[in-house]
């Protein structure tokens, strides 16, 4: 089992990132590119677009619920059927609640090291976000997650040998740096 398989696992996301199902991977990449292009270059606004999609979905669901027996063999699920203890929506809200609780515990200040790390990461994300939009960052992450594993799988030996050489060079530079730093005279301690 290769390193990429160990990292990604063997689920649907791994199949998508490794292009095992070329049609779904291609559709995902093309749709993400079109969505990014629409919002970034065509200057469409996200909230009106989401509201339009929501209105369209509500209209389709309404027509399906009222006239579903005529056009479809299956009726949509009722609200009572969706209100199940194992509902995906409840799982999503539970996960969001867990993340918010974790942030609250960090902000409460019991672990100062974790608090400072969180502040540092948020500041880094803030600085990156002031130059690049969130949508562009998410698009770059998607494209990288769909291309880097495939390129690594194809050129694994070449990349591993190159990274080995880079690691050796880094270790050599660290040794030279330690030698240079050791030659710098130390100031006497003042009491």
Swiss-Prot record:
It is a multi-pass membrane protein. PROSITE patterns: RETICULON. InterPro entries: Reticulon (IPR003388), Reticulon-like (IPR045064). GO terms for biological process: response to bacterium. Signal peptide: none annotated. Its main location: endoplasmic reticulum. One of its GO terms (cellular component) is endoplasmic reticulum membrane. Residues 13-191 form the Reticulon domain. Keywords: Endoplasmic reticulum, Membrane, Transmembrane, Transmembrane helix. It comes from the Eukaryota. The chain crosses the membrane at residues 23-43, 47-67, 122-142. Pfam families: Reticulon. It is found in: Endoplasmic reticulum membrane. This is Reticulon-like protein B15.
């Amino acid at each position: 089992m290769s390193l990429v398989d160990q990292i990604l696992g063997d689920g649907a996301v791994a199949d998508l990132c490794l292009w095992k199902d070329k049609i779904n991977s291609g559709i995902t990449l093309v749709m993400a590119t079109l969505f990014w292009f629409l919002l970034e270059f065509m200057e469409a606004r996200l909230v009106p677009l989401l509201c339009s999609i929501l209105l369209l979905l509500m209209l389709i669901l309404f027509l399906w619920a009222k006239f579903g027996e005529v056009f479809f063999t299956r009726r949509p699920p009722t609200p009572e059927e969706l209100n199940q203890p194992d509902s995906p929506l409840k799982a999503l809200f539970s996960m969001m609640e867990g993340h918010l609780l974790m942030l609250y515990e960090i902000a409460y200040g019991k672990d100062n090291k974790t608090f400072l790390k969180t502040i540092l990461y948020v500041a880094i994300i803030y600085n990156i976000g002031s130059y690049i939009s969130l949508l562009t960052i998410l698009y770059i992450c998607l494209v990288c997650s769909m291309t880097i594993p495939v390129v690594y799988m194809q050129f694994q030996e070449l990349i591993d040998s190159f990274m080995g050489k880079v690691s050796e060079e880094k270790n050599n530079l660290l040794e030279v740096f330690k030698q240079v730093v050791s030659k710098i005279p130390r100031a006497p301690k003042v009491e």
